[in-house]
Amino acid sequence: MMDLDNIPDTQTEAEELEEVVMGLIINSGQARSLAYAALKQAKQGDFAAAKAMMDQSRMALNEAHLVQTKLIEGDAGEGKMKVLVHAQDHLMTSMLARELITELIELHEKLKA
């Protein structure tokens, strides 16, 4: 992995940076997918599986958030990372989905109790 404290000036470093940003997008997407899979399990009454999937979702989201924080710190407002906006969108929608799905799972648990 490249040094996220220094934003690249060369094409090779830019390609490495894009790879890191893609990792942010992938982790965010994985977090969202796991959260929706957890909701499906909760709707079927399998709350243990739902909890396990939400734990996995949280870990993927934490990884994505860590990368995002380092990228933002490294860019220092210079706008060198065009794809970062797309990556941030993935992260924020994943965070929102996870929060809402947590609430929905709790509602399903109460309804099935």
Regions found by a protein language model. Give the residues of each.
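Terminal alpha-helical segments
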Residues: 2-113
